[in-house]
């Protein structure tokens, strides 16, 4: 049972990178619609109607608002704290608490994925062009499903490893008694 928890180090490093990028994204200001319009004017693509450009601007602005909401900021900060706490537990070789803390992080990430999905569906409703709305809706669903599946796989891996550790510990105790 003295194996090193490499799986948890890998998961925590990936989670730390995600948390850091989320924290940096949160620190940036919400762009104004005028800034988005000027950026869209510079990237004007042939065959794109004015309504599609306006839909894209409204969608982008709403997504930026959602990503800077108090609930989302609280999720990001709490996630970063949980990752740091799990790393501290792992450094101190308290694997059980590190696992529990990481499970909390993953559950929080799943809540964040659900919140992001609901927010993106709200933003999609601002799009008037039916083709664009359908494309954005499918894209947001695919991203949300992907993130949820990844988080569930991480959760399953941690639960499996915790089960194996408990089983090995029980076998060691049985051998000591015998």
Where are these regions (language model features)?
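Cytosolic juxtamembrane helix and N-cap/initiation of the first transmembrane helix
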Residues: 1-39, 157-167, 176-178
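Membrane-water interface of alpha-helical transmembrane segments
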Residues: 1-12, 62-72, 92-102, 134-144
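Canonical alpha-helical transmembrane segments of integral membrane proteins
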Residues: 12-24, 78-83, 109-112
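Interfacial non-cytosolic loop connecting adjacent transmembrane helices
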Residues: 33-69, 115-144
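Hydrophobic alpha-helical transmembrane segments
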Residues: 47-54, 71-100
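Hydrophobic alpha-helical transmembrane segments of integral membrane proteins
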Residues: 91-128
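Terminal transmembrane helical module of multi-pass membrane proteins
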Residues: 134-178
